[in-house]
Amino acid sequence: MATINSKIPAGPLKEKWTNYKDHQKLVNPANKRRLDIIVVGTGLAGASAAASFGEMGFNVLNFCIQDSPRRAHSIAAQGGINAAKNYQNDGDSVYRLFYDTIKGGDYRAREANVYRLAEVSNAIIDQCVAQGVPFAREYGGLLDNRSFGGAQVSRTFYARGQTGQQLLLGAYSALSRQVGLGKVKLYTRYEMLDVVLIDSRARGILARNLVTGKIERFAAHAVVIATGGYGNAFFLSTNAMASNGSAAWQCYKKGAFFANPCMAQIHPTCIPVHGDYQSKLTLMSESLRNDGRIWVPKDIEDAGRLQRGEIKGKDIPEEKRDYYLERRYPAFGNLVPRDVASRAAKERCDAGYGVNNTGLAVFLDFGDAIKRLGRDVVEQKYGNLFQMYEKIADENPYETPMMIYPAIHYTMGGLWVDYELMTTIPGLFAIGEANFSDHGANRLGASALMQGLADGYFVIPYTMQNYLADQIQVPRFSTDRPEFEAAEKELQDRITRIMNVKGNKSVDDLHKELGHIMWDNVGMGRDKAGLEKAIVKLDELKKEFWSNVYVPGEANDLNVELEKALRLADFIEIGTLMAHDAMDREESCGGHFRIEHQTEEGEAKRDDENFAYVSCWEYQGEDKDPVMYKEELVYEETVRAQRNYKS
């Protein structure tokens, strides 16, 4: 039977990370030159980790699914990155950032990991400023801050609405330096399709060259997964089209535990679905909730007129508007956490108060902000976001309210990792959104960038040394070993099987079916009947995929449809595990909302007595039910309580 050992250091919470660093094992410079590390992914987490390893003297193989690391999905992050510098002198501190993150995650995250995240947050800002990241500054030249959901302080550093882009360019510059020095070898347009184990340790990967179609083998002393989340299991999401969960999923099928798979985040401010042919959704930054006010009509008749296109939002007078977040949550108003804001929007729309032709939208209105601050100030703060909205929605948000609706955005679940960010497979690490470690049941806005850079710059450079210190006598592995041969044969057989189906349905059609199943049954509101239905339908969809998918072209060539088919096969299985996990967790917490478990006011109702744990799923084989283990969550610094954002 597997055991769960999170390796949390002993001692007071505030001293754990310092004590770890003081007593960890080290690798001297001469030995670092003999050790190889594979980093899969070149987003913020992957690029920062690869650059850090190269700077330290390790030999790094870095894999990028795009044609350049600059196209990683991290570039899409808009609003900002959190850090506890307290530049605004408004009461912020490392402890408050830690507490807000624990509370925002609905008390389903490890205290030790979250405190470390808050502790290193300030160093991230210093690092990025040193790299030249152009953070917004106040008139006097000091770095500026704004507020995000789930906090009552301004701790979010930003670069207009392009923070992810600017941070990624900083990490990319550091990575490029190491590529130029020869310490990092960068493989662009490669997709990892399997991890190779030798003597139960991660010692390499198989990756498909997406240009030639060739399967290639790569060996190393350790492997780092930094491939992001699995939100595209819902088909429509704010994720980039290439974002997928396949690398993490293949690690799961080789023995790495998958943690809290049901914890998916619905972002409250996304541009609503516009038609059946849409392939992705567009996020509108959470920063807009600083000055934008969310509302629906008070009168159902006005909602009907909006839905029929008879009037516009600006035609409804102030006294007939329901600013429902301000009404329900006066202490936080429009800056409640994402899960709370999303459920509130869904409740209003389900009650018939939606404001577009589908009834699935609410208003995000800047009329008051423009009156208070002036259009020039609003344009300076949010201009590029307003331009993006106008191009997509064909409406001027300076003159008429934006329309928004929740959409899948981020996954808090991922590969289980211990305090050192290592999975249950020795030598296999997971960082950034690919792991589960820091956000519990709900991530606070502006904390994804914080975690990615914390893991890559300030955590794994220490913990990787601690692991590799015992590997310095291990010689480099040949990719001709039987373990690589067997893994490649299994992968080639899988690809051949997909290519030989020659069915009647396209990959996109089947992916849309998956999306409907997931959104309708494993989305914002979940119940036993819906989850049971999802499990049955997902099993049927899996059978249809393997009997009726059509993939044109050749396997040994550039073939985008084959890429999508391989990912979809994994998404179907990921969706099934998500449904099982959601079924097992008989409580509501954060992004996991079981309709049977809510308060009289419709808020999430946790069950700390029975479900204060991380669910850790172990793969048992094809068509066999996975086994779930529990990592019990112990809270020594915080007192668990039902979240209250009303006072």
Predicted segments — roles?
Residues 67-99, 265-269, 276-280:
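Conserved N-terminal glycine-rich FAD pyrophosphate-binding loop of Rossmann-like flavoproteins
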Residues 124-214, 226, 270-283, 289:
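Conserved redox-cofactor binding core of oxidoreductases
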Residues 1-37, 643:
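Extreme N-terminal leader/targeting segments of oxidoreductases
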